[in-house]
Amino acid sequence: MEDINFASLAPRHGSRPFMGNWQDIGTSNMSGGAFSWGSLWSGIKNFGSTIKNYGSKAWNSSTGQMLRDKLKEQNFQQKVVDGLASGISGVVDLANQAVQNKINSKLDPRPPVEEPPPAVETVSPEGRGEKRPRPDREETLVTQIDEPPSYEEALKQGLPTTRPIAPMATGVLGQHTPVTLDLPPPADTQQKPVLPGPSAVVVTRPSRASLRRAASGPRSMRPVASGNWQSTLNSIVGLGVQSLKRRRCF
């Protein structure tokens, strides 16, 4: 069995395959180095331990002992405590004052709200002469509407409900006899026909060109040219009606 080179099937970084001893894929060795949180945390711890060592050495030295004695003589610790206590008490006093001011503002009566004066109506000098009429002199207008009679009243009186037609009119029983208006005139009178008056007759003399055209007969169609599409279209559609404008004086 022949040896198969599987390196040709592996992914490549340029001309170098990703297999063999080069197995550092995804580490800081690729792409010029990556950011490592572990190295950052270890560096911070080393820096803190270094500062602690230097501080302990300085505190335990002779200079540190002299500094501690001097602070004890000046009662530095008591001053720090007193300063912190005074600061805390000042903050508490300010808070108490703010709360007390809010309580007093709520307990004190509110000042009365000044209402604006009512607006004065200004009367124009033109309207001063007009006075409102007194109630005893007021006139009451009563309008009467003529409504049509009810159905029972119309039947009792025997009045027609529609305008009667002359050939179909019949007698109506009742107290009052109906009178029909707007009837056509009787057909006995014959109207004489009105003859129209004499009117002026205008006689026009035909021109010589029209006489020649009438004598020559109908116009013959133009010969159709074989190679011209306009002449073919004129032979199919025609040239239309030839109009002739003439001015005549009467």
Curated annotation (Swiss-Prot):
Annotated region (Disordered), positions in chain: 103-147, 206-226
Entry GO CC: host cell; host cell cytoplasm; host cell nucleus; viral capsid; viral procapsid
Pfam families registered for this protein in UniProt: MCPVI (PF02993)
Biased segments, Low complexity type: 206-220
Signal sequence segment: none
Highest taxon above the source species: Viruses
Record note on modification: Ubiquitinated by Nedd4 following partial capsid disassembly; which might play a role in intracellular virus movement during entry.
Keywords: Capsid protein, Cytoplasmic inwards viral transport, Disulfide bond, Host cytoplasm, Host nucleus, Host-virus interaction, Late protein, Microtubular inwards viral transport, Phosphoprotein, Ubl conjugation, Viral capsid assembly, Viral penetration into host cytoplasm, Viral penetration via lysis of host organellar membrane, Viral release from host cell, Virion, Virus entry into host cell
BP-aspect Gene Ontology terms: lysis of host organelle involved in viral entry into host cell; microtubule-dependent intracellular transport of viral material towards nucleus; nuclear capsid assembly; viral release from host cell
Site (Cleavage): G33, A34, L239, G240
Region of interest called Binds to importin alpha/beta, involved in hexon nuclear import, as start-end residue ranges on this chain: 240-250
Region entry Involved in endosomal membrane lysis, spans: 36-53
Chain spans, region Interaction with hexon protein: 48-74, 233-239
Chain span(s) of sequence motif Nuclear localization signal: 131-135, 245-248
Positions carrying Phosphoserine: S124
Segments carrying motif Nuclear export signal: 67-76, 231-242
Propeptide boundaries: 1-33
Signals that turn on the gene: Expressed in the late phase of the viral replicative cycle.
Residue numbers of Phosphothreonine PTMs: T143
InterPro entries: McpVI
Family: Belongs to the adenoviridae protein VI family.
Protein name stated in the entry: Pre-protein VI
Organism (species): Human adenovirus C serotype 2 (HAdV-2)
